[in-house]
Amino acid sequence: MTPTLTDTAASFSRRGLGVLRTAGAVIGGLGLAGIAAGGAALAWGSIERTMPTLRRYDVPIERDVPEVTILQIADLHLFAGQEFLLHFLSDVASSERFDMVVATGDNFGSLDAFDMVMDAYRPFLSYPGAFVLGSNDYYSPIPKPWTRYLMRSTPPPARVVPDLPYLPMVRQMRDAGWVDLSNASGTLSLPGGTVSLLGTDDAHIFRDR
């Protein structure tokens, strides 16, 4: 059997956002009809975000490289009422086979979500892992009205003082042996060999170096 690298990505992004972008591009020229379409798209986005998805990707690699299965966890944006995501992640941890975990940030959906975030990751911390942070690990989300898609608006001033408890989260992940790849490199030892990793902090908030 030819070795391949199997990248198993657990993506919890809102698939409805694709619909939102399409509707948003049309709304400006449709007046009230466009607003109605936008409302329908937003409603679908609200429904579909409750349906997390496990996606699988096969990445071809060199013949002599051992097969590795990577679980990626991204964009949880956790807040009260999303306990279904914790159940989903627990099911993934117990039913899927993977060799290592990569967490790519944006874990918080509210200021008080720290316990939920750590509960989400607890089933995975016994695996080799690495992580980077996203803007919603440093700064809590700012609610935005959907009408902002209809008109130009002045962007809010950039925040420079984090208000989310990212340091305790980072500490617990490091204590579990996970590698912090925020503007850093590192390695993970797997049964099939050593994996070299390189990461950056979030470029959208100018923390990459």
Label every model-predicted segment:
Residues 13-44:
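Hydrophobic alpha-helical topogenic segments used for membrane insertion/localization
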Residues 1-10:
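Charged, low-complexity N-terminal segments of organelle-associated membrane proteins
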Residues 35-119:
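N-terminal active-site segment of His-dependent metallophosphoesterases
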Residues 84-189:
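Core catalytic region of metal-dependent phosphoesterases/phosphodiesterases
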Residues 197-209:
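Catalytic-adjacent loop/helix segments of enzymes that bind and process anionic phosphate/sulfate esters
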Residues 135, 192, 199-201:
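A mature extracytoplasmic/lumenal domain signature
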Residues 58-71, 178-179, 185-197:
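Beta-strand-turn-beta hairpins that frame and shape the catalytic cleft
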Residues 73, 104, 132, 198-200:
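Short hydrophobic segments within beta-strands
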